[in-house]
Curated annotation (Swiss-Prot):
Record lineage: Eukaryota, Metazoa, Chordata, Craniata, Vertebrata
Pfam family, one: RhoGEF
PROSITE patterns for the chain: DH_1, DH_2, PH_DOMAIN
Stored Gene3D superfamilies: Dbl homology (DH) domain, Pleckstrin-homology domain (PH domain)/Phosphotyrosine-binding domain (PTB)
Gene Ontology cellular component annotations, sorted alphabetically: cytosol
SMART domains per UniProt: PH, RhoGEF
Oligomeric form and interacting partners: Interacts with RHOA and RHOB.
Organism this protein belongs to: Pongo abelii (Sumatran orangutan)
CDD domains, sorted: PH_RhoGEF3_XPLN, RhoGEF
Protein name: Rho guanine nucleotide exchange factor 3
InterPro entries: DBL_dom_sf, DH_dom, Endocytic_GEF_Adapter, GDS_CDC24_CS, PH-like_dom_sf, PH_domain, PH_RhoGEF3_XPLN, SOS1_NGEF_PH
Function comment: Acts as a guanine nucleotide exchange factor (GEF) for RhoA and RhoB GTPases.
Record keywords: Cytoplasm, Guanine-nucleotide releasing factor, Phosphoprotein
Length: 526
């Protein structure tokens, strides 16, 4: 889901590689020299969100994680590009269209480079990368409309209403970026160098506030697109496009996600320009102002996107009985994390961690829409007990303590429990790996700590979910003193979870009432 911190990316020129072919039995032929490898520019990188570690991060990094999760869904819904299609025939595969990566020093007069310092050349490269990225973005947005939207509308593959939902306000973004590209070209000197970009950015960046509606729509757009892929005509059309050279092996959602991906890169791009700008350059002050502007816009869009995603999933909760409804769900504006789970009986569940309540559901189809039917009563976070289970403590089938299955330990389990009077629940959850298990543990602990602190209880949670009093240093369990004392009869549901997009944004709740989590669709037939 996430990886390491990623420094500012500048495309690099790849060296030619020669291939030595073994001699053939026929007439000898010179081995052909392959063409240069080409590197996809910044706009082709799926998301810097994939390059951020699961630790405390800056608001900007948390936002990129949030948006990435907002459009990350089950891989099962994606077409298998390697699978043979009935209409494929045995024709020679068409060559994939690639976009050349360009450097400023390779594009303009080399003599100019010799007159500039190394620092200034790096500054020009960063400015050129900004400009080239705008050009690539505009080209891709126009391609999405021309190659996907318009043909599907003309061929009645989707209705106009469905296409409007999926493409959102994409059309309105094109003129914004055309304006910036035009201004950047206007200030470029005949020799290719650019002296000042700060004033242009300060004047242009505020228009990116219009991204809020586009980004807020992405969760619903992705859900509808995944649903429409079940239609044979839609799947066939998208597969043909994917295998066509113009797509560069990118599917439709890759194109629709490019604006969001570009948005979260602006602070990095501007910081790189600023890093190579001398202190006495008038551009420095303007660049610092521009960075503050874009970070404010990113934070605001982060908030609105989080609220939109939270609303989306709340609207798709199905209650089996009136008693399952909880005011904590209705009042939630933050979805910390959610993911598909599987219990030790093989039952798939989908768990949502809102800011103050944990909701366990089963994914079902209702009126041709993916919905989430509540599986048990919602669990208030403040009363939730969390336990990190050692490998081997849970066995498929429900047995506990040192159990084994086929001589292999059952790994990556943790348990959430709740007891309030006559009501009690115990759920043993299994993550798909150690990394995702730790993400869930961190997120639940952070959510619980935030709720308890908001209630006026100072302290922190230890690794076992116990609340530590900072004054006495003593451990105070919220609820029963030991999880083993809880009722584990018919209220137990041992779950296993696929949490490749679990959110670590719970810390964000301490600073704002909004946050988003990951989104991943799951289907469960129980």
């Amino acid at each position: 889901m996430v990886a390491k911190d990623y420094p500012f990316y500048l495309t690099v020129k790849r060296a030619n590689c020669s291939l030595e072919l073994p001699p053939a039995s026929g007439p000898a032929k010179d081995a052909e020299e392959p063409s240069n490898k080409r590197v996809k520019p910044l706009s082709r990188v799926t998301s810097l969100a994939n390059l951020i570690p699961p630790v405390k991060a800056t608001p900007l990094k948390r936002f990129s994680q949030t948006l990435q999760r907002s459009i990350s869904f089950r891989s099962e819904s994606r077409p298998d590009i390697l699978a043979p299609r009935p209409w494929s025939r045995n024709a020679a595969p068409s060559s994939t269209k690639r976009r050349d990566s360009k450097l400023w020093s390779e594009t303009f007069d080399v003599c100019v480079n010799q007159m500039l310092t190394s620092k200034e050349i790096k500054r020009q490269e960063a400015i050129f990368e900004l400009s080239q990225g705008e050009e690539d973005l505009i080209e891709d947005l126009k391609l999405a409309k021309k190659a996907y939207h318009d043909p599907m509308l003309k061929l009645s593959i989707m209705t106009e209403q469905e296409l409007n939902q999926i493409f959102g306000t994409l059309d309105s973004l094109i003129p914004l970026h055309e304006e910036l590209l035009s201004q950047l070209r206007d200030v470029r000197k005949p020799d290719g160098s650019t002296e000042h970009v700060g004033p242009i950015l300060v004047g242009w960046l505020p228009c990116l506030s219009s991204y809020d509606s586009y980004c807020s729509n992405q969760v619903a757009a992705k859900a509808l697109l995944d649903h429409k892929k079940q239609d044979h005509r839609v799947q066939d059309f998208l597969q043909r496009c994917l295998e066509s050279p113009f797509s560069r092996k990118l599917d439709l959602w890759n194109f629709l996600d490019i604006p969001r991906s570009r948005l979260v890169k602006y602070p990095l791009l501007l910081r790189e320009i600023l890093r190579h700008t001398p202190n006495d350059n008038p551009d420095q002050q303007h660049l610092e102002e521009a960075i503050n502007i874009i970070q404010g816009i990113v934070a605001e869009i982060n908030t609105k996107t989080g609220e939109s995603e939270c609303r989306y999933y709340k609207e798709r909760l199905l209650y089996l009985e009136e008693g399952q409804k909880d005011s904590l769900i209705d009042s939630s504006r933050v979805l910390c994390c959610h993911g598909e789970l599987r219990n030790n009986r093989g039952v798939k569940l989908h768990v949502f961690l809102f800011q103050e309540v944990l909701v366990i559901t089963r994914a079902v189809t209702h009126n041709e829409q993916l919905c989430y039917q509540l599986y048990r009563q919602p669990i208030p976070v403040k009363d939730l007990l969390l336990e990190d289970l050692q490998d081997g403590e849970v066995r498929l089938g429900g047995s506990l303590r040192g159990a084994f299955s086929n001589n292999e330990r059952i790994k990556n389990f943790f348990r959430v429990s709740f007891k309030n009077g006559s009501q009690s629940q115990t759920h043993s959850l299994q993550a798909n790996d150690t990394f995702n298990k730790q993400q869930w543990l961190n997120c639940i602990r952070q959510a619980k700590e935030t709720v308890l602190c908001a209630a006026g209880q100072a302290g922190v949670l230890d690794s076992e979910g116990s609340f530590l009093n900072p004054t006495t240093g003593s451990r105070e369990l919220q609820g029963e003193t030991k999880l083993e004392q809880m009722d584990q009869s018919d209220s137990e549901s041992d779950c296993s979870m696929d949490t490749s997009e679990v959110s670590l944004d719970c810390e964000r709740m301490e600073q704002t009432d909004s946050s988003c989590g990951n989104s991943r669709h799951g289907e469960s037939n129980v």
